């Protein structure tokens, strides 16, 4: 089999490339996906409120685990990644967050990445999006990804939590992806107007499937990329449960879109990576690139949970006897509790004036439960998910063998920087001050977690070590740039070889301030134009907020304990 392009991974980026490249009728594309189809009748992936279900099994989830994390009581921590058409957009929380404008301006300040500024990227965010309330300078109206905004009449806890954030002295913003990300406000979600998950399989692949120049093969586990000298020429993959070896060849390029965990694995198995690692595993060296699998970053988060004095939370939706009615309303009408991911409010703040853009993110949830559906509190409750955004901690990914079925060694090295501890202590104390504001007086009951007895630094640190969890945002493990640890250039081309690009969240040089899916899609849209030889979209001239000397907060309505200063 021979094609112009072979795309490895039908996830948030791979599906974008498949759809855009096949817009050229004379181009042939093979899309390889290790998982299966995105079954449209499977409520576990299609119902927004069921987002925890795919993380509980291995049908749609690679279910990676980290090595024992040394600063987290040596816990082996979850690292769920999507498996199937749609990749992680098939199992994520559906929060449509792009990151802060300053994230991209920081990227553009790095050598070789000058065209990755926010105003360079904004047109590609708009190109990908159809927002249900229409386009403007920041949002698109004709893109493949449906974005739904919160509606009047949604849960009152969303509004109370945003109001409490403002009463605590932080800004309000009406659009976390608009002029000003900083502040508290409504949160958009990747959900269709009919209440279905808007994965990239639904948005992009549905447009591309009818085209004769696109071939999609599922249950195709990539073994390695093939080379003739320094040029990528094809892909060796294993088909089906039997693992039958197959080979496909690329006339133009191989496009690796496996994500931040799989892409460095595949590169390393293919002979691209740290020379010592490859030599130890007897993998023939094609190109020594020490940065492959390094610079690994993620967002860590905690839940602060409270009982709710009024019966307005989503606790009844967790009871089995209420779920058939919820499911029927969603299935036939696309409405009701089932049609929302229930992350309809949140925010981004600076914990201190020293930060030039937000370093803390909030997701508000009108029920008390773990992200993966475990440990639900058996009463009315609500919670704030809170975590730091740009940790200095860096991890790594290393293959353990040549076997593509064997999971790699993953170490995020969470909380390895003193800054991490300062930020998380601040985050807990700030959250408590937010929850204590008058807007939540009608609802706020006792603190369930961490608990009112957890107060001093040592007590907070012990809670963080034992209870902080991944936000499922691995990234940056094949970073772009031109320094000695960079893996790809600003167009995704792997250094030192020809005919091979990496296009996914792994090429971010630094993790963004927020959820990753929207930015991963943008990256693929932007590089797709480069691959096709198209003129880049015109740079936006939209104005956007820069904090400058603006204080991180004003005086709160109700004071709580002061945040201790950094040493």
Swiss-Prot record:
State its cofactor. FAD
Q: What reaction does this enzyme carry out catalytically?
A: choline + A = betaine aldehyde + AH2; betaine aldehyde + NAD(+) + H2O = glycine betaine + NADH + 2 H(+)
GO annotation (BP), single: glycine betaine biosynthetic process from choline
Q: What is its EC number?
A: 1.1.99.1, 1.2.1.8
Q: Which residues form the active site?
A: 473 (proton acceptor)
Checking Gene3D superfamilies in the record gives: FAD/NAD(P)-binding domain (3.50.50.60), Glucose Oxidase, domain 3 (3.30.560.10)
Q: Where does FAD bind?
A: 4-33
Query: What name has this protein been given in UniProt?
Result: Oxygen-dependent choline dehydrogenase
Q: Which organism is it from?
A: Yersinia pseudotuberculosis serotype O:1b (strain IP 31758)
The uppermost taxa in this organism's lineage are: Bacteria, Pseudomonadati, Pseudomonadota, Gammaproteobacteria, Enterobacterales
Name the gene that codes for it. betA
